Amino acid sequence: MTRPLCAPKAQLTGIKAVLFDAYGTLFDVYSVALLAEQLFPGQGQSLSILWRDKQIEYSRLLTASRKGPQREPLYQPFWEITRAGLRYACKRLQLNLSSELEERLMNQYRHLSAFPENREVLQALRDRGLRTGILSNGDPAMLDVAVKSAGLGELLDHVISVDSVRKYKTDPEAYALGERATGLPASQIAFVSSNAWDALAATWYGYATIWVNRQNIPFEELGTEPAYTGSTLRAALDALSPA
């Protein structure tokens, strides 16, 4: 019998804080497709998908690579690689991206739509005495605008950017920021992400990981699975429900 792709597992215990990935988990990275479709009819969805894929590819490439004889680390702020990903995607799709259109799309990315269940879930977690926060590849300025636009500021104890270590997820130093900010060991922190690669790496790091499988797709086939899986952010409530 085939196991359901969003089958949950046992509830998590001993959790004192819940950290969320931002882009794709709290904020809908594909909501930019509506504007993209208006600007480039028939190409909006393709552009938004390729843009996101390239953004993530660039983050991994920079973190994994070293430059020159001294093997110097490479880093560019997430805003810059987001712009680079947009430019690449438009070239790949043979779309004429003027400076004006670029700024319109980048501004839309700055104000991505939040998923509707965000406030309910964050408030419920705080009502249970759990600390909440974001652990994201986004740079501080991006996260500040996104959080304020969504009205989530008062529901978050921590907004953590990997910019402080200049390394992107899935580097362990990026995930270590969660322990540093909360003062808790990874085993007492639930990490919530809709990105399977992120959930996998966070599990390897030691977090109790909740995967939000919004697209009902298989998890990565590398021998490790998240502690809990659901189809919306409410999976965090289900995973951490009182016994």
Task: List where the protein language model places each region.
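Asp-based, Mg2+/Mn2+-dependent phosphohydrolase catalytic module
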Residues: 2-15, 123, 135, 139-140, ...
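Short, acidic loop-to-helix structural element flanking the phosphoryl-transfer center
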Residues: 75, 79-80, 95-133, 144, ...
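A metal-dependent, Asp-based hydrolase signature
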Residues: 45, 53, 58-103
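Alpha-helical elements of Rossmann-like donor-binding domains used by nucleotide-donor carbohydrate transfer enzymes
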Residues: 34-35, 50, 84-88, 104, ...
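Hydrophobic side chains within well-formed alpha-helices
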Residues: 32, 47, 101, 152-155
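Short helix-capping segments at alpha-helix termini
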Residues: 40-44, 92-97, 151-155, 183-184
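Hydrophobic alpha-helical core bundles mediating ligand binding, dimerization, or RNAP-core interactions
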Residues: 36, 51-55, 82, 105-109, ...
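Active-site neighborhood of HAD-like aspartate-dependent phosphohydrolases
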Residues: 6-56
